[in-house]
Amino acid sequence: MKGLIIVGSAKVGSHTTALSQYLKGHFEEHDFDVEIFDLAEQPIHQLDVSGASNLSESYKNNLQTLKTKAREADFFVLGSPNYHGSYSGILKNALDHLTMDDFKMKPVGLIGNSGGIVSSEPLSHLRLIVRSLLGIAVPTQIATHDTDFKKLDDGTYYLANEEFQLRARLFVDQIISFVKNSPYEHLK
């Protein structure tokens, strides 16, 4: 089974990326092939349905990679920092490039991180988007705070909060259960 984690932070090495890497490790323990598409490291161009924009080749290539991975995915995890009480614009842009066919009846996990006030509002907003894309947002979600992470000597963040480590396992188990036991397989 294949999964795609889309990280919607504009910061390379973000807390959202660290949480995504933690989750990836747990999926891999269950022999799932999971890739992280980090929009800070692989930026894509703004959606332009007119075709008037002069697009860079690297942005075009990144977008094609995202679209291919989305088509191949059996499930998604969407991750975003809390930007002014909602999810990031770059994640919205990435989702605008994808279609209902990419998400139709596939489980979607939602994760977010806040630097200020802890809030699950970005995840509530994403839940509506997932429904509009015909995906199935799983009930368990993860909303962390910067203080739930520690830094390694090289500056890389890692999830240190044991409560969220436990929640991450529940989150992964729930997505795996949805993937393996989907009553909607015939609707894809």
Curated annotation (Swiss-Prot):
Q: What is its EC number?
A: 1.7.-.-
Provide a Gene Ontology MF annotation, just one. oxidoreductase activity
Sorted alphabetically, which InterPro entries does this protein's record hold?
A: Flavoprotein-like_sf, FMN_Rdtase-like_dom, NAD(P)H-dep_reductase
Recorded superkingdom: Bacteria
Keyword Ion transport in record:
no
Listed A to Z, the keywords are: Flavoprotein, FMN, NADP, Oxidoreductase
Does the keyword section mention DNA repair? no
Cofactor(s) required, per the database record: FMN
Give the GO cellular component terms, alphabetically.
cytosol
**Which SUPFAM superfamilies does the record cross-reference, listed alphabetically?**
Flavoproteins
Stated family: Belongs to the azoreductase type 2 family.
Its biological purpose: Catalyzes the reductive cleavage of azo bond in aromatic azo compounds to the corresponding amines. Requires NADPH, but not NADH, as an electron donor for its activity.
Q: Subunit arrangement?
A: Homotetramer.
This one is known as FMN-dependent NADPH-azoreductase
Q: Which organism is it from?
A: Staphylococcus saprophyticus subsp. saprophyticus (strain ATCC 15305 / DSM 20229 / NCIMB 8711 / NCTC 7292 / S-41)
What gene is this protein translated from?
azo1
